[in-house]
Regions:
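A short macromolecule-binding patch
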Residues: 47-51, 156-166
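Non-Sec secretion/translocation targeting segments of pathogen effectors
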Residues: 65, 189-202
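Structured surface patches comprising rigid loops and adjacent beta-strands/short helices at the edges
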Residues: 163-176
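Short beta-strand-centered aromatic/proline hotspots
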Residues: 112-150
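Mixed-charge, Lys/Arg-rich low-complexity intrinsically disordered regions
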Residues: 74-122
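Short N-terminal "domain-start" leader segments
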Residues: 1-38
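Short aromatic-glycine-(Arg/Gly/Cys) micro-motifs in beta-strand/loop hairpins
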Residues: 27-56
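A short, charged, amphipathic alpha-helix used as a generic interaction element across diverse proteins
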Residues: 60-75
Length: 202
């Protein structure tokens, strides 16, 4: 990608809106008189986390492609709304008062930590996206030089990598929701079973 200019092949990106799990791009190449306007989707679902463009559509009609662009954005908004409607727990995010501060002199391994809301996309700034179990990574250690913190989301069970500075703090036990306690039990039980299998295979 050229400095100050985002490109998709020969097309210059003029509009980009990120909603949910992807970004919708509108790009222009005035040199292609037969198809100067292009719309595509972009995500980063790969080991290197680089731009991955897909589902392109092109035309010489600006209004047609702008309509395609806005339709895709609307479809993503509806998908995120539908996803949120399925959530069965209170959504109000945790703040600093719910946590012990992120003390770099202490280990956070195997502790339930809270992700800072500002590190989450606006549509995901809810408690179900904040609560995670820190399961490993150099960033979990006390006085660590590393930053990586590998986590398991208590609501979805999905694994993710964060940096230590993305963490607001360790959740105070008195604020642990009932649903999170149950999910934590299941996650820990699964980890113990997996560890037992690995030991038996040696």
């Amino acid at each position: 990608m050229t400095e100050g200019k985002r490109m998709v092949d020969t097309y210059k990106v003029t509009h980009a809106i990120h909603v949910g799990d992807r970004e919708i791009l509108f790009a222009v190449d005035d040199g292609k008189t037969d198809c100067p306007y292009m719309v595509c989707d972009c995500n980063w679902d790969n080991p290197l986390g680089i731009d991955q463009f897909f589902d392109p559509a092109g035309s010489d009609d600006y209004l047609e492609m702008m309509t395609e662009f806005t339709n895709r954005v609307q479809a993503q908004l509806e998908a995120v709304k539908a996803e949120r409607d399925k959530i069965t727990v209170p959504l109000s995010p945790f703040t600093q008062e719910h946590c012990t501060p992120n003390n770099y002199g202490e280990s956070i391994e195997n502790k339930v930590v809270v992700i800072r809301t500002e590190r989450l996309r606006h549509e995901y700034r809810t408690v179900n996206n904040q609560l995670v179990l820190a399961v490993g990574g150099f960033g979990t250690y006390a006085n660590a030089r590393g930053r990586a913190v590998y986590t398991v989301n208590l609501y979805s069970g999905k694994e993710a990598r964060w940096n230590r500075e993305d963490i607001l703090g360790v959740l105070k036990p008195e604020y642990m929701p009932g649903w999170a306690k149950e999910q934590l039990k299941q996650i820990l039980a699964g980890q113990q079973a997996k560890h037992k299998e690995q030991v038996q295979e040696r």
